[in-house]
Design a protein with these regions (language model features):
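Conserved, structured core segments of small domains
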Residues: 1-88
Length: 88
């Protein structure tokens, strides 16, 4: 199942802690990429990200997103969007 995850920084989040966790976030994303769970990732050119996950269920994606270091620290929100094929 393909899931889009939109990650946005929380308003008034601790920027020092955010910067401190960025390397751990990158490492976590690289691990997901190497395992085949993260198929692609994009940045809007500012803090935040859009991730494409390949997982079994929407709940799997939500758990993965919640476990990311910045999400676990309460410094980003994650919106999990299941994608479905379109008949064209």
């Amino acid at each position: 199942m393909q899931i889009l995850v939109v990650c946005r920084p929380v308003r008034d989040g601790d920027q020092t802690e955010f910067r401190r966790l960025v390397p751990a976030e990158g490492a976590a994303l690289r691990e997901l990429k190497e395992s085949g769970v993260l198929s692609n990732a994009w940045t809007p050119g500012r803090p935040g990200a859009v991730l494409m996950l390949e997982v079994g269920t929407e709940d799997d994606a939500a758990a993965i997103a919640a476990a990311l270091p910045l999400a676990a620290a309460g410094l980003i929100t994650t919106e999990v969007i299941p994608l479905h094929p379109m008949d064209l």
